[in-house]
């Protein structure tokens, strides 16, 4: 009888040690975090055949490919939208009109956007090309963030965590290494950069500079391998 009691106490101690919470709790393993698909809210912009033809024509001018499909993406480009809400980003991408910067069709877009609270919104399937980064639209998935600077996102824990968890799942889905998760400002140094139009060669944006992306990639690496 006494041996049974001692055995039950030992089992209870082991279970109690494994069920701790708070500061003593173990974080999820890398494999668990990498495999978790976060909730994704669909807010699909109109992308009819006309816009697809325009995207194929754009790809011909800039990449020498008459294609609108995004096959086997090789990298993920991180942006901030200079916008204060998801609806503002959606409305910028929704209408198919010449973009304000280069006056080309189709209009610009990114595939996803992360809200200030960390929620993920899907604008375009990652099997369709979007105009978000000159020289890389032929092979890159674009992710916008609500905010007006890199630091806006890096200093909002909920948004940063939501972004990291989503990008971890997305890169694992497509077999994209952490080194190929880049900021828009890093586009010109990408080995995948390709631009045939001389007017666009050397063009990039200031969002997500190298130093801030090093911080982002370091945090992403902490989530582990796929």
Feature locations, PLM:
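Short glycine-rich beta-strand segments
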Residues: 81-83, 144-148
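Second-shell loop/turn segments in exported
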Residues: 63-65, 109-110, 147-158
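Basic/polar, cationic surfaces and motifs that engage anionic cell-wall
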Residues: 28-52, 70, 149-226
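Hydrophobic h-region of N-terminal signal peptides that target proteins for export
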Residues: 12-18
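N-terminal catalytic cores of peptidoglycan-degrading enzymes
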Residues: 2-9, 20-133
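Short coil-to-beta-strand
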Residues: 134-145
């Amino acid at each position: 009888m006494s041996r049974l009691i001692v055995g039950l106490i030992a089992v209870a101690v082991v279970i109690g040690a494994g069920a701790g919470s708070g500061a003593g709790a173990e974080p999820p393993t890398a494999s668990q975090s990498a495999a978790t698909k976060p909730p994704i809210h669909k807010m699909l912009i109109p992308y009819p055949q006309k816009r697809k033809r325009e995207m194929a024509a754009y790809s011909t001018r800039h990449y020498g490919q008459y294609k609108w499909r995004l096959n086997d993406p090789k990298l993920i480009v991180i942006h901030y939208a200079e916008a204060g809400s998801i609806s503002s980003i959606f409305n910028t991408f929704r209408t198919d009109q010449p973009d304000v910067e280069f006056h080309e069709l189709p209009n610009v877009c990114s595939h996803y956007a992360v809200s200030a609270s960390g929620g993920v919104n899907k604008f375009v399937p990652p099997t369709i090309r979007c105009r978000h980064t000159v020289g890389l639209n032929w092979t890159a998935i674009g992710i916008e963030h609500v905010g007006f600077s890199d630091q806006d996102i890096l200093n909002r824990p909920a948004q940063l965590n939501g972004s990291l968890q989503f990008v971890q799942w997305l890169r694992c889905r497509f077999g994209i290494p952490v080194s190929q998760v880049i900021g828009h400002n890093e586009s010109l140094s990408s080995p995948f950069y390709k631009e045939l139009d001389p007017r666009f060669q050397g063009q990039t944006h200031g969002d997500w500079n190298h130093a801030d992306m090093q911080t982002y990639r370091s945090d992403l690496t902490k989530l582990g391998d796929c």
